[in-house]
Curated annotation (Swiss-Prot):
Keywords: Coiled coil, Ligase. This is Putative cysteine ligase BshC. It comes from Koribacter versatilis (strain Ellin345). It holds the Pfam family CC_BshC. Belongs to the BshC family. Residues 431-451 form a coiled coil. GO terms for molecular function: ligase activity.
Amino acid sequence: MIPDCIPLAEVPHTTRLFADYLAHSAKLQAFYPALKYNQNLAAYTSSIQYQPGTRDRVATALQILNERLGASPEALANIERLRRGAYAVVSGQQVGLFGGPLLAVLKAAHAVRLARDLTAQGTDTIPVFWMASEDHDLAEVDHVFLPKNDFSLQRFTADATGTTGAPMSDLRFEPTIENLVQQTSELLGDSSLVDILRESYRPGETVAGAFGKLFARLFAKHGLVLLDPADTELHRIAAPLFRRAVAEAAEIARALVDRGKELEHAGYHEQVKVSASSVLLFGIQDGARVAIQRQNDHFSVGKEKLTQEELLARIDAEPEKFNANVLLRPVMQDTLLPTLAYIGGPAEVAYFAQGSVVYERLLGRATPILPRFSATLIEPKVEKLLEKYDLKFEDINHGADALAEKLAQKTLPPELDEQFRVALATVTQTMAQAKDALAKVDASLVEAAERATSKMRYQVGRLHRRAARAALRRTHVLSQHADLIVNALYPEKELQERTVGAAYFLAKYGLDLVDTLVDAAGTCPEHRVIRV
């Protein structure tokens, strides 16, 4: 039986940096100044400098935004708590179609759970979800994958209209979105979730706005506060940060280049390529997001050249025409919010290693970052097959063909399977005895004996696999079972949470599944298995 909590070392695609971060490796301390606070977030409150005037302005902006998204009384009450002095736990994600992959809901659930726990422990904290509405890559968010009856995935793609390269806060769904919701309902069946999709995803609604309305409903009782960084008032509050990103661009770029070298020297790599001309801002020109580069004493904004004074004046006049890149975004977040912790995935954890120099220069501190809630949901039909074949989580992560072969091995005639087991044991035992005898004759022969043992074990195992493939050819049932298990738990050779739309689970198991995920979020520090 697969355990409820799986070490991330057994989970595919875990990078060295992320594994070291989970292990609290001492060599990462220089890259994560706030790592020491991860086990005691309340102690970090003394590091947060947050002006009452900023608190009030941000709370008012969040109130207006969340009311527009249909916020619950619980969410609006949390905004008032922020106004009165509460801290924030923040997570965020791209505004994927119909809520995007499962991991977006997992992140929000983790923020809710952590804020709840911190408040219970005496540190008043609210959960905030940062919608990545300023991203401009529509191809990353215009689709969702939902499982069919055999758990193979069906892709649903939406049409959105607007300027090419425009942020998600400006792109609007075309009338075809109604047909897409109907197609989704035909696959998922009628449910409360589908009703919410119909109300949220309507012609003319922005990509970010529809996502926000959906999440406002999903997390209504939990008081999740949604933040749209494209909001004009939030840009006005962040304008001084944007000014410093320009005025100190040369020093920031130099610090980032040096940090990249330090990461490489430590055996890691930088997530974002930075050069001496890099500026951590984008500009908006003709509705599209364009990079800003520094060239000696001038700056290029797309094809336009400006002096530093001209660029700073433009930021003062129209701060909403600028937004932060991936390294400045967390600093903007923590300029706007009294952030006690950010909950991020492996890539975000890696960004923090590089971006902490930006934090320290522009904010005077670095925010603690916690690995996000990671989980695989196992449905009853799949669970029965896992139990039938006595499978482990790692058995699933090599694709359907490898799993089918594994299943065939498990279903070989018991006497044949036992003979292979005995053969391996005999080879190992016999060669161990031979190795001991050889050591007395000539110690140099021990290594040769070990190589011979390895080759013989390989050949026995190879013959075992060939026997399994022969058995597999005689039945399609094992292949079907392997396909079903892999499609459900490791689709497209990715973790389920990164691929399967949360809408599938919420439609099938009800909106109360959100409560289950919130409760589960604090129970496993690595990868959680949840049986639904």
